[in-house]
A protein has these predicted regions:
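N-acyltransferase acceptor-side catalytic subdomain
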Residues: 1-175
């Protein structure tokens, strides 16, 4: 059991090597959600994930789910939905609304890690040009989508929501 969890200094944006994370991927705690700190974290394979009113926790799980675009397979049913052009797909039109939809607590969940401080930080990162939303609209209404951070050739998806079946999947496909 690895228990090397490092405290972060609010005045330094230095992160420990993710190889020092615990068995669940927790690598550090503390610091703040300054957009520059968050971007440095992402470039080091680390991201914040914590409940409101708890200390900020910084994670780097191994293994991590990765979608290799050249190996991405679309199911027949999803392909049918994509080809139907049922949804209008847009990007970065309603970033904050997408985050707020992702924030809504699902019936089978106790809470959400997406709270106002997270929304404020990711909105600033969006304004910096690194956070993006992908959106599916049906008859002019936002019905699915998600958001994440883009660094070089890597997109780190953070959360998705769907008010209609396959809406977020179709938007993700077009990403």
């Amino acid at each position: 059991l690895n228990i090397n969890i490092f405290p972060l200094d609010k005045h330094s944006y230095t992160f420990p090597n993710p190889l020092y994370s615990d068995d669940q991927g927790l690598v550090a705690f503390g610091g703040d959600l300054n957009p520059n700190r968050v971007m440095i974290a992402y470039t080091n394979g680390i991201f914040p994930w914590y409940n409101e009113d708890d200390p900020i926790l910084w994670w780097s799980p191994n293994p991590r789910y990765i979608i290799e675009l050249d190996e991405f397979k679309v199911s027949k049913s999803l392909r049918k939905t994509i080809n139907s052009n049922k949804f209008e797909i847009k990007f970065d039109r309603n970033f904050v609304q997408v985050m707020n939809e992702c924030k809504k607590i699902r019936e089978d969940k106790e809470g959400t890690w997406i709270h106002e401080e997270v929304i404020e930080t990711y909105t600033k990162i969006h304004e910096m040009g690194f956070a993006h939303s992908f959106e599916a609209y049906y008859e002019g209404e936002l019905v699915g989508g998600g958001y994440g951070i883009n660094i070089g050739d890597i997109f780190c998806g953070e959360s998705m929501f769907a008010k209609q079946s396959d809406a977020s999947k179709v938007a993700l496909y077009h990403l």
